[in-house]
Amino acid sequence: MSRPSTPLLDKAPTPDRLRALPEQDLPQLAEELRTELIDAVSTTGGHLGAGLGVVELTVALHHVFNTPYDRIIWDVGHQAYPHKILTGRRDRIRTLRQAGGLSGFTKRAESEYDPFGAAHSSTSISAGLGMAVASELSGEKRNVIAVIGDGSMSAGMAYEAMNNAGALDARLIVILNDNDMSIAPPTGAMSAYLARLVSGRTYRSVREAAKQVAQKLPKFLQDKARKSEEYARAFFTGGTLFEELGFYYVGPIDGHNLDHLLPVLKNVRDTQKGPVLIHVVTQKGKGYAPAEAAADKYHGVNKFDVITGKQAKPPANAPSYTKIFGTSLIEEARHDDKIVAVTAAMPTGTGLDLFGEAFPKRVFDVGIAEQHAVTFAAGLASEGYKPFCAIYSTFLQRGYDQVVHDVSIQNLPVRFPIDRAGLVGADGPTHAGSFDTGFLAALPGFVVMAASDEAELRHMVRTAAEYDEGPISFRYPRGDGVGVDLPERGSVLEIGKGRIVREGTKVALLSFGTRLQECLAAAEELGAAGLSTTVADARFAKPLDHDLIRRLVREHEVLVMVEEGAVGGFSSHVLQFLATDGLLDRGLKVRALMLPDIYQDHGKPDAMYAEAGLDRTGIVRTVFAALHRDELGHEALPTPFRA
């Protein structure tokens, strides 16, 4: 299928060329950019809806501002695909989220037009404020623009940054991309006129002059004059909250109308003094009918047919871990009316949408607010409820102080289902679930589990529901299960007890998590090479199964720990126990396999695990090396001494 014709876009591969185009050509350029975006994402998959919603805004920003000298920071980065196309990366846009290709988010190492990396929400205003202050300290006059969605404004960090920006009176532009119309809709021509008026040099100059006059009046009259101006402007334009935080508010304006966007951006660029917030209203999926009709389904997409909008979906061999968690929690909630669920703006991603359908009054979506989610769950637990606070591994990092201070120190029985544990593939290092085992197992009294398959996950949901002695977590990966038989309801596991899955005599593989299947495959290969191999499923990183570990040490020559986490996790706890228990004093050969001490770039999960040595081949190679055998399993001959 041939690619769409884009004559204007072909002339503007970089922002300097874009700025050379006359303004009357920009609407056509925007349409060509939208067409190119749809065509590209149809072949790669990725985040579509958000990018379609900011096409005109992206064109306007790069036309008005002198990028890359002026800084544009895209919050989260889902909406940055049009930005990538316009900033010299169009020739690689069809490598999005593929190994060796473009990142799905902004990335400093990728382009000078990406001044700050993103993927987690609500960081843009803080980063932008730092850049704005650095610019002032350096005597620069650059503009710094942070583009943040209304969803990201539910996180406290955004308001912390705005409060600080207002106090510093910094030269910072924040563009609020309101694509859910959750704050206020634009009201047509009058709204556009007012936005252009209040953002302009004349209005703001008169306003400043009036302030100077007011300073000569008694203080109570100064206050009345200031409040009168603010109230009058707020009445017509909204934005009182942002004014109270110290921002000059402009909007709301139609984010798809370049005739409205361009003059406002120019006014703010030319007259900016102190922080300014421009409220832009957009539509997710704008310009592509299937995405406009179902914005939630086109936020993140698989490859799809451009004509029909139908997404390609590979057949599943088993239910996903996320679905198993959701259905298992529903089953437990039927037996226990104290079970409730908490999510931080990810009900579908965590499987709690299913729970919400079954128990709508027992699920709580708190928005993008992981810190609040954790402490909210702690409050529920303190009153005798059984909260399951379901958060992706990478996002739980955002609420770690609350996990420590509000949950762990008080020993409150909050349950933490940790989705997206391990490598997540196309979303790369910003979304990898690498660190949760290490940072949770470091906490006294915290029970830390990992499911090796979907049946084990069902058992762990039941175990967590029954456990009231303190906080407990269980981790599981993205994607489909391995296809094991599922019990109708999980069983309660004995805390701190693992299991032997395969018996052997010479080599022991101790797995924590879903690398168990690779361990079993490696055991087959090792057995064929004459190395009888035991495979154990640890189940718990804390408390460790000391009896199981002692048995593996006593009965085997080699012990290999295998996990889908970073340095400092399960293997570190096992090694510490081996050392303190004197189990390393007997000539045991011990090896630890975990994620490498780097941030792995995006790619396909299987290839990434192979790169990390966490597949069958890597495990076998590690055992052979420990026993000084070559790749065929033969004992390596000693190197002859040469004088």
UniProtKB/Swiss-Prot annotation:
Gene3D superfamilies: 3.40.50.920, 3.40.50.970. Pathway: Metabolic intermediate biosynthesis; 1-deoxy-D-xylulose 5-phosphate biosynthesis; 1-deoxy-D-xylulose 5-phosphate from D-glyceraldehyde 3-phosphate and pyruvate: step 1/1. Keywords: Isoprene biosynthesis, Magnesium, Metal-binding, Thiamine biosynthesis, Thiamine pyrophosphate, Transferase. InterPro entries: Dxylulose-5-P_synthase, THDP-binding, Transketo_C/PFOR_II, Transketolase-like_Pyr-bd, Transketolase_BS, Transketolase_C, Transketolase_CS. Its EC number is 2.2.1.7. GO terms for biological process: 1-deoxy-D-xylulose 5-phosphate biosynthetic process; glyceraldehyde-3-phosphate metabolic process; terpenoid biosynthetic process; thiamine biosynthetic process. Its cofactor is Mg(2+); thiamine diphosphate. Mg(2+) binds at D150, N179. It catalyses: D-glyceraldehyde 3-phosphate + pyruvate + H(+) = 1-deoxy-D-xylulose 5-phosphate + CO2. It comes from the Bacteria. Binds 1 Mg(2+) ion per subunit. Binds 1 thiamine pyrophosphate per subunit. It is an enzyme of class 2 (transferase). Thiamine diphosphate binds at H78, A119, H120, S121, G151, S152, N179, Y288, E370. Belongs to the transketolase family. DXPS subfamily. Catalyzes the acyloin condensation reaction between C atoms 2 and 3 of pyruvate and glyceraldehyde 3-phosphate to yield 1-deoxy-D-xylulose-5-phosphate (DXP). PANTHER family: 1-D-DEOXYXYLULOSE 5-PHOSPHATE SYNTHASE-RELATED, 1-DEOXY-D-XYLULOSE-5-PHOSPHATE SYNTHASE, CHLOROPLASTIC. Homodimer. This is 1-deoxy-D-xylulose-5-phosphate synthase. It comes from Brucella abortus (strain 2308).
